[in-house]
Amino acid sequence: MLTERKKELIEKIPKAENHIHIEGSIPWELALRLAEKNKVSLPVHSIEEIDSWAHGLIGERGLDGFMICDRTLNSVCLHEEDYEAVVLALAEEDKRQNIVYQELHLDYPLNEERGIPLEVVMEGYRSAQRKARELYGVEIVYIAGLDRTLSGERCLSFVKSLRPYLDMVAGLGMDCEEKGHPCIKHLDSYQEAKRMGLFLTAHAGEDGGSDNIWDALRKLNVQRIDHGCRAAEDPELIRYLKERDILCAMCPVSNVYSGAAASFEAHPFLTLLRAGVPVSISSDDPPYTNSLTEELMTDAEKMNLTEEEIIRVVRNGFAYSIQGQGYLPAFDAWVREFQRKGAD
């Protein structure tokens, strides 16, 4: 059981989040409202039905099952105001959890395959980015996500299409089903993104091997690894990540849920953390898993994290972020006050 002090720490500490997907994080209540508004037929008609349907698919098919859920619920977004509404709903929830800085992966290909123009999606997200700060005091940073299952040519075209949006998009990532789709398939996209000045990250080692992580690091020259579970199986890779101070933005609850990790006890997060690899914790796709606060509570309890480890992991979310380092002085001051009160 968590102590009351650890619970208070997790609830009240200022937070950053490095790894959460917009399209996978549409609040289910909002998804149902948008489906009704836009006359989109869904196979589920209540939050309870969504929960049962999603658990069944993900339990049976893991990451592939999640992608079916993701694509299905994302189909409710058709208009600029829909995309704005999703991000603003996330920002409102951020405020409740004391999340002041959040990096959101936007997976436009999930919209492109439905014929939604890029400008509709991006202008909705642009408006939400501005309003999130004004209404909720939350800084939103966007990472454009490649669907690694698509062709290299199509992904490169997407990266080039981001040029008019470099004022709002700060990074390039890669996600979707990993098996059978090695990172190197999208080398041209990453080289183009680097020329455009984008921060580079990639999902690797989630349901694929450590070789995918090596390819992302050495061939794509990424500055961060998303998930990175299989890194813990490779001592040389652990040393590499530690020596080069490369963050693994991890999502333990999501990994256990999808089968990428057998259990919390077997999750590689602790191995990496205690080996000195920078790790942060994020919620990944909160309607399916937990909010960030709930994620931290669960991980701290299941993995028996110390108070110092909780603080270090949360601090890493700012320290290794794309542009959230400016929050560190206020974060460190908050921690000092929390520790001082505990010592009184």
Stretches found by the model and what they are:
Residues 1-198, 207-215, 219, 223-224, ...:
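Metal-cofactor-binding active-site regions of metalloenzymes
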